[in-house]
Amino acid sequence: MNKDRVALIIGTDIATNGFESGAALRLGSIKHLLEDTGFKTSVASRKTAKSFLKSDWDLVVLISFSTSSLLRHARRRSKMLWFDPTDSWTLTRLSLLFSADIKQAFILIRDLFFLWTSPKIDLITFISERDSNKERLWWGKRSLPLILSIDGLDREVKPSKYPRLVFSGDGRYRPNQRALKFLSKTSKFLPPDLQIHLIGRGIRNTSKNFKVHGYLSHQDMYFANDIHLAPMKHGGGLKLKVAVPLWNGLHVISTPEGSSGFKKSPRLKIASTPRNFAEQISEILREGNQGEVAKPRHEIYLRHDEAEVRLWLRSFA
């Protein structure tokens, strides 16, 4: 009888705190992939990782650039090492730094040190090809990264006869704050009775055209005929604000930045300015009720190397 292969996944505190987030979704999808290919998995946060790394593992997976300080320790305790930065360290850190988040300068230097001094890494994955290409400087002499997009996006879409404009996100996050300012400007080009529904923690009502719902579980977030708005201007990765509604067959309007990594789709509209956003909203509203929602699923991504990752996982005993 073959001995069970054991894997340890190390994620950020946000990814392991039990709340739904992009980081938690990423960790969950990698955990599912490991279990589906025959691994018994354990999960640790950065804070608890060292106690888990007192044992030996067949595979250790580190998710996020902020776990890079554990690469050397993980290498000593595992047969194989998988590093999933997820999105581009350069795009994410620099965009926050340019937003006057000064502490990002220190985090940037810290992560850079651990990246350049890291040991051999057997598999590197990113969430999109764009993110991978932005980090070519440090992985160029290592293994060629694979692209592992977002899974686990199935959501219940409840029936509704009426369209809603929807923005979801944490209001404490700077890119979301900028997006809300963008939408406040967008609302000036819309009919005065047309509201934008805001879903998420920490969102303040800054416009008479906004309706704030606070945090909602994903069972109550998605309705047929919703139009999801994602005016993101900075950062890396695939935007969940785009991925989740698009995966589930809903209309999305986003910027060139927010739509990066996704295929062209009749349900994904691109706009760069508040006026353009309002024009795209009006165009979708003129089309009327979209009827039964068709779910395109993996067809939304430009590239998804899950089959190659599965093959790699099955290649060692």
Residue ranges and their predicted role:
Residues 241-244, 251-255:
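Short hydrophobic beta-strand element within catalytic cores of glycosyltransferases
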Residues 75-94:
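Active-site proximal beta-strand in glycosyltransferases
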Residues 14-33, 145-208, 212-223:
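Conserved catalytic-core segment of nucleotide-activated headgroup transferases in glycan assembly
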Residues 223-237, 248-250:
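Acidic donor-binding loop of glycosyltransferase active sites
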Residues 52-69, 82, 123:
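Short N-terminal targeting/anchoring amphipathic segment
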